[in-house]
Every structure is written in structure tokens, then in C-alpha cells.
UniProtKB/Swiss-Prot annotation:
GO BP term, example: lipid A biosynthetic process
Organism: Mesorhizobium japonicum (strain LMG 29417 / CECT 9101 / MAFF 303099) (Mesorhizobium loti (strain MAFF 303099))
Family to which this protein belongs: Belongs to the transferase hexapeptide repeat family. LpxD subfamily.
Protein's UniProt name: UDP-3-O-acylglucosamine N-acyltransferase
InterPro entries assigned to the protein according to its UniProt record, in alphabetical order: Hexapep, LpxD, Trimer_LpxA-like_sf, UDP_GlcNAc_AcTrfase_non-rep
Active site residues of this protein: 257 (proton acceptor)
Functional description taken from the UniProt entry: Catalyzes the N-acylation of UDP-3-O-acylglucosamine using 3-hydroxyacyl-ACP as the acyl donor. Is involved in the biosynthesis of lipid A, a phosphorylated glycolipid that anchors the lipopolysaccharide to the outer membrane of the cell.
């Protein structure tokens, strides 16, 4: 549930305001003044809550909704109780997220963990670092020589920013995160415990065992990227590791040296991307995906969760399985194996 102790709504919105803000169509203009000050799942709802229904899986909830208003596609609009204001939108969840950011702005973007409004007296900042006015540096932060931090950026307690790193404006670095050898754009969110710019896993076989290869590249993180808690992004060996604009990376993701990820990609938790992989724009990776080194994943590809990739994926294709292959082929193989297993079992039972 949404606890107002943690997340108080910014203000009340009317159904008419929500329609205008999201580009939705309010079915009954007589419900323009319906008040909305909470968000809830359709299965729970609430007296002043906005909910959304976006597929046949949860459309069965429509007749029994308990909510102030619902965002839904046109085909479900006539199934809602008359007491619920219906807002028609082709992408209800997207509209719902927009309203959520307006109702609960502090939940949409991380902020200071303390009441600090400037630079804490308990932070260590090298005299050669440049912190723009309006940045917030909380207690326990360590900022090295030559660092630049833009206005509006929050550096949470005990984060460490290494020598000469640049962090743009209106960003966030979470508690205990560490950043080194990195150039970071504007509005970048790096959650607590993340590690950016450490050595890539570079070793070469030697007479006495593995020998370290110096990693002398950087990490470049473009604008509007988000990196989840305890994820790691290794710096390049000689070229850069690059995370493209708008890409969102979940918790516990490993990105190795020299990887290049395009724009607006989604990488779900527990995924691992090996060295020198190139990922195009608008790629989606499910949880636990593993990519072998030096692969190319084409723009718009979708990679199924828990899949292992040892070959390139063409643009726009859906792949999955282990080893991964086009999803239709993977499903056919699974169906064939099941058929063969059943036939074998029946043969044993009859014989």
C-alpha cells in the first residue's frame, strides 16, 4: 500500500485534469470533478484511487472495480461500474505512470537521504574539485581531485567519486556507490551500491599464471540513464564502455569492459554482458540473460529471460533458450521434446 508517511501526494487531481495531462478521453463529462489522490492496482483500488486495466488478463476486474477512476483501452470502457470515471487511453500503463510522477514526484526521482541542502561539513571534497551551486553533497561523501559535479545533482551518504570524474546536472548517486574513470551526463540516476569504472576482467595467460592487462579506458554514461543497486559497469580496456542515452539497467547487472549499449534499452536484473558486446538501440533483455563476449545484438531485439547467447541476434528479432535461438524455433523444439517424451512414456506403459 502507499503509506503517506513515505509518499504523500503532491495534491489532488480531478478526472478532467488527468484526461488533459495524459491525452485520455473522459467518457462521462459529468464525472469531470472526480477527485484522484492515490494510485492502486486494479485488484485493490480505493475510494480516491486511480487504477489501470490494459489487457484481457485483468479486464475481468472491470465490473467489480472499487476506484475513483480507471485508465483503460476503448474496448473495456463499458465494463466499468457507473460510479467509476473511465479514461480511455491506448496505452493505459504509460498514462498511469505519468500521473504517478505528478502525484508522487519524490518517488519518481531519488532525493537526499538527509535534510542536507548543500555541501555537508562531514563530506571530504578535494580543493580542486568543482561542485556547482545547487548540488547536494551529503555526509560521508568522498570527492577526489578534479571532479566536476553539476547543479541539482545529489550525492548520497558515503558515495565515493574518483579523480577527474565528471557528473552532469540533476542526477543522483546513491549511498555507498563508487564512481571512477567516468564521464556521466545529465539526469543520470545511479542507485546505492553500484560500482562504475572499476577494472575490467582483463587477464592474459602467463608462465606463472594469469597476468593482469592494464585497463586504461573509461566509462561514458549518456543523459537520462538509470543504473540499479549493486550493478557494476567496468571501464574499457583501451576503448570506452558506453551506456547510451535513456537506457535503464536493473539491479545486480554486470556490464564488462568495452561494452557498448545503445539508446533506450532495458536490461533486467541478474543479466551479464561480457566484454566488447555491442547492443543496438531499443533492445530489451529479460532477467538473467547472459551474453558471451564480442556479440552484436541488433536494434529492437528482445531477449527472453534466463537465456544464454553465443551468437549474434539480428535487429528486431525475439530470441530465447539455451543456447539462444529464434523464439519460434526454441518453442518448436520444446514442443517436439515434450511429444517425444510422452510417446516414450506411453511406449513403456504399453510394453
Amino acid at each position: 500500500m502507499t503509506d503517506p508517511v513515505f509518499f504523500a501526494p503532491s495534491r489532488r487531481y480531478t478526472a478532467a485534469e488527468v484526461a488533459n495531462l495524459t491525452g485520455s478521453v473522459l467518457v462521462d463529462s459529468g464525472q469531470s470533478d472526480v477527485s484522484i489522490e492515490a494510485l492502486a492496482p486494479a485488484s485493490e483500488g480505493g475510494a480516491n484511487a486511480l487504477v489501470f486495466v490494459d489487457g484481457r488478463r485483468n479486464s475481468a476486474l472491470m465490473p467489480s472495480l472499487r476506484a475513483a477512476a480507471v485508465l483503460c483501452p476503448a474496448e473495456f470502457a463499458n465494463k466499468a461500474p457507473s460510479s467509476v470515471a473511465v479514461l480511455i487511453h491506448p496505452r493505459p500503463q504509460q498514462a498511469f505512470a505519468l500521473v504517478g510522477r505528478l502525484l508522487f514526484p519524490t518517488a519518481a526521482t531519488p532525493g537526499p537521504m538527509t535534510s542536507e541542502t548543500g555541501v555537508s561539513a562531514h563530506a571530504h571534497i578535494d580543493p580542486t574539485a568543482h561542485v556547482e551551486a545547487g548540488a547536494i553533497i551529503e555526509a560521508g561523501v568522498v570527492i577526489g581531485p578534479g571532479v566536476s559535479i553539476g547543479s541539482g545533482t545529489v550525492i548520497a551518504p558515503n558515495a565515493v567519486i574518483g579523480q577527474s570524474c565528471q557528473i552532469g546536472r540533476d542526477g543522483y548517486v546513491g549511498p555507498g556507490a563508487s564512481i571512477q574513470y567516468a564521464l556521466i551526463g545529465n539526469r543520470v540516476i545511479i542507485h546505492g551500491g553500484a560500482r562504475i569504472g572499476q577494472d575490467g576482467f582483463g587477464f592474459v595467460g602467463g608462465a606463472k599464471g594469469p597476468e593482469r592487462v592494464p585497463q586504461i579506458g573509461r566509462v561514458v554514461i549518456q543523459d537520462d540513464v538509470e543504473i540499479g543497486s549493486n550493478s557494476t559497469v567496468d571501464r574499457g580496456a583501451m576503448s570506452d564502455t558506453i551506456i547510451g542515452q535513456g537506457t535503464k539497467i536493473d539491479n545486480l547487472v554486470q556490464i564488462a569492459h568495452n561494452v557498448r549499449i545503445g539508446r533506450n534499452c532495458i536490461v533486467a536484473g541478474l543479466s551479464g554482458i561480457s566484454g566488447s558486446v555491442v547492443v543496438g538501440d531499443n533492445v530489451t533483455m529479460g532477467g538473467g540473460v547472459g551474453l558471451a563476449d564480442h556479440l552484436t545484438i541488433g536494434s529492437g531485439a528482445k531477449l527472453a529471460a534466463r537465456s544464454g547467447f553465443m551468437s549474434n541476434v539480428p535487429a528486431g528479432e525475439i530470441w530465447g533458450g539455451y543456447p539462444a535461438q529464434p523464439m519460434a524455433e526454441a518453442m518448436r523444439e520444446i514442443a517436439m521434446l515434450r511429444t517425444m517424451a510422452r510417446a516414450r512414456k506411453q511406449g513403456k506403459d504399453n510394453g
